Amino acid sequence: MTDTRKSPEPGVKLRAADKVARIPVKIAPTEKPLRKPAWIRARTHGSPEVQRLKRVLREQRLHTVCEEASCPNLGECFGHGTATFMIMGDICTRRCPFCDVAHGRPEPLDAEEPENLARTIAAMGLRYVVITSVDRDDLRDGGARHFVDCIRTTRAHSPDIRIEILVPDFRGRMDVALAILNEAPPDVFNHNLETVPRLYREARPGSDYDWSLDLIQRFKETHPQVPTKSGLMLGLGEEMHEVEAVMRDLRDHGCDMLTLGQYLQPSLHHLPVKRYVTPEEFDRLAEIGYAMGFSQVASGPMVRSSYHADQQAQKVIPEG
């Protein structure tokens, strides 16, 4: 039967059931979610500092992945005056069923965003910032030029800042994207594999495991002095031997830093949590990671790719 549903108008956000309606592996709403164990905790989001930072972001028309992806650490990070900025809008062209960012047809890029971002970062007095983005498959360069504009403008306003970028996979656009990023390389290059290859069709429709590994390797070959980073979420049904295999693949492709955290289901329409990985298992994976040669491993139930990113980078980036 032909699917006659129309694509949403630009700017219309699809979430939950609407977002995952057309992915290859269908997801039935979760009826009985697993009970969260005692080690899964997150602070509330109602502190004055959290509310102040949210106001600043709205005034500057900026977005954070902390809010859009419903990160459980939002209260802690915002409470310390730090955030991971999400550029190029808050609508993603992908439909990954683990992610709470909305799907749809994005609006055109905001030409004022690099300046607004740079001024906000300078006003906050940040010394380390993470800049990430939604997937923009509608752009010929995947958004690489906008990343470079944001990096350059931020450095112009804050010359001593360290910038980590958490990039999409630039599907079908790797050559042009990497060529553009060469103009203003970040201080840390991060691209998340998210899960083991067996679960890609279900968890990362539209993405390719080997493509993502190649992206990390090619950036590292061009910029050997820039630390590379990737992350996995656990609890989607992967086996530990598969996780270790991915870790080995990352090392073989030049990845220096690793984050491992527990997947938490954003809504009943997202992928269910199959298992809560214990803190002891996360500690063991960290030991394995260091034995493999990773220079920095952050592994724990509440760890996220950008969580305490400044502290993760301290051991890797030499003081300038």
From Swiss-Prot:
InterPro entries associated with the record: Aldolase_TIM, Elp3/MiaA/NifB-like_rSAM, Lipoyl_synth, rSAM
Keyword tags: 4Fe-4S, Cytoplasm, Iron, Iron-sulfur, Metal-binding, S-adenosyl-L-methionine, Transferase
UniProt enzyme class: transferase
Pathway: Protein modification; protein lipoylation via endogenous pathway; protein N(6)-(lipoyl)lysine from octanoyl-[acyl-carrier-protein]: step 2/2
PROSITE patterns referenced in this protein's UniProt entry, alphabetically: RADICAL_SAM
Gene3D superfamilies according to UniProt: Aldolase class I
Cellular component annotations (GO), alphabetically ordered: cytoplasm
Reaction(s) catalysed by this chain's protein: [[Fe-S] cluster scaffold protein carrying a second [4Fe-4S](2+) cluster] + N(6)-octanoyl-L-lysyl-[protein] + 2 oxidized [2Fe-2S]-[ferredoxin] + 2 S-adenosyl-L-methionine + 4 H(+) = [[Fe-S] cluster scaffold protein] + N(6)-[(R)-dihydrolipoyl]-L-lysyl-[protein] + 4 Fe(3+) + 2 hydrogen sulfide + 2 5'-deoxyadenosine + 2 L-methionine + 2 reduced [2Fe-2S]-[ferredoxin]
EC number(s) stated in the UniProt entry for this protein: 2.8.1.8
Binding, [4Fe-4S] cluster 2: C92, C96, C99
Cofactors that this protein relies on: [4Fe-4S] cluster
Subcellular location: Cytoplasm
Residue ranges occupied by any Radical SAM core domain in the UniProt entry: 77-295
Family: Belongs to the radical SAM superfamily. Lipoyl synthase family.
UniProt name for this protein: Lipoyl synthase
Naturally occurring in which organism (per UniProt): Thioalkalivibrio sulfidiphilus (strain HL-EbGR7)
Gene this chain is encoded by: lipA
